[in-house]
């Protein structure tokens, strides 16, 4: 997800000489590649299956390497061969994606100086969050739907996001009950657990290969969705895929807050034109004017971005 924030910060792919294989897959099926087509030419073969070949990174002659703080051994490997390396945390703010991207933007400013397109991003995000909070608070005894976010699919099981993850932030702030709160982080869940929870709303991350129709048409092996409220009432939604997958922190995180709130409380946020918000945001911060077709594809993505080559 850092790549999308980097491109937002620098106004493009300037200085970017290597990206992860997962980032390239997401870019190929998102609008990152449409905005900056040459990102698909940036090398990613130094990483296979999530494992980094440090010697191959060295051949790229980077001035600095960014890596995930959850992989300290990777940072040590870079330093052993003399490469300056900076870690970026994805969980520093206990699942708050707004705090996370603000942190990342601060790091990038310290490294590169003033950014090209970031003035106002954090403010927009905080104003959006406050609007959602105020509207939910003003609604008084608003019914909070039971909801679950499926983050992926592993070991023939859907993976649910619980506490201490972005799901906690989105569902709490946007007015829902996280039925998977008993899970610390992410964990595979079976059919019996889903029946026990009986979520009224299901949100699907872009790391998960399924789309709402797979739930409605019972196409997920090992699961029968006919008795689940969210499926019976056609309240299964796929997270949008804009400049990156919207569930984790990205340049589009401020928009994601609005989108989640609207899926959970469509009547309360019926006046929000998410397509207009998206268009205005992209024009202001990415200097890119999406077409109606672009917006439709962003808001209703397919399954391709979950496929890692």
Show where each model-derived region lies:
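A short, structured surface patch at a secondary-structure boundary
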Residues: 1-60, 64, 69-70
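Solvent-exposed loop/turn segments at secondary-structure junctions
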Residues: 1-3, 22-25, 64-65, 70-74, ...
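Extracellular/periplasmic catalytic domains that process cell-envelope and extracellular macromolecules
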Residues: 9-11, 58-59, 79-80, 139-143, ...
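Short beta-strand and adjacent tight-turn residues that come in two discontinuous sequence segments
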Residues: 18, 67, 87-88, 181, ...
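Alpha-helical, coiled-coil/dimerization segments enriched in small aliphatic residues
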Residues: 46, 159-186
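Short acidic active-site motifs
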Residues: 52-53, 73-74, 189-193
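Extracytoplasmic substrate-binding proteins
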Residues: 74-156, 177-181, 231-301, 305-308
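A contiguous binding-surface segment within folded domains or other stable secondary-structure elements
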Residues: 181, 186-241
């Amino acid at each position: 997800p850092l790549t999308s924030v980097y491109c937002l910060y620098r106004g493009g792919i300037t200085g970017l000489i290597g990206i992860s294989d997962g980032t390239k897959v997401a870019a190929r099926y998102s609008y990152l590649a449409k905005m900056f087509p040459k990102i698909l030419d940036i090398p990613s073969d130094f990483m296979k299956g999530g494992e980094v070949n440090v010697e191959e990174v060295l051949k790229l002659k980077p001035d600095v390497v960014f890596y995930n703080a959850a992989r300290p051994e990777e940072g040590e490997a870079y330093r052993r061969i003399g490469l300056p390396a900076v870690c970026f945390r994805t969980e520093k703010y206990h699942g708050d994606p707004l705090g996370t991207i603000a942190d990342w933007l601060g790091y990038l400013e310290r490294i590169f100086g003033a950014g090209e397109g970031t003035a106002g991003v954090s403010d927009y995000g905080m104003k959006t969050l406050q609007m959602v909070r105020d509207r939910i608070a003003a609604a008084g005894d608003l019914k909070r739907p039971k909801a679950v976010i499926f983050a992926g699919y592993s070991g023939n099981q859907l993976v649910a996001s619980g506490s201490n993850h972005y799901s906690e932030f989105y569902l709490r702030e946007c007015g829902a009950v996280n039925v998977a709160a008993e899970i610390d982080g992410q964990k595979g869940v079976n059919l019996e657990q889903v029946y026990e929870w009986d979520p009224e709303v299901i949100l699907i991350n872009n790391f998960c290969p399924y789309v709402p129709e797979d739930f409605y048409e019972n196409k997920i092996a090992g699961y029968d969705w006919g008795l689940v409220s969210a499926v019976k009432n056609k309240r299964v939604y796929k997270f949008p895929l804009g400049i990156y997958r919207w569930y984790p922190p990205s340049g589009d995180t401020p928009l994601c807050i609005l989108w989640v709130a609207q899926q959970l409380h469509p009547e309360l946020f019926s006046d929000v034109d998410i397509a207009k918000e998206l268009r205005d945001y992209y024009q202001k911060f990415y200097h890119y004017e999406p077409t109606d077709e672009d917006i439709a594809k962003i808001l209703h993505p397919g399954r391709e971005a979950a496929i890692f080559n």
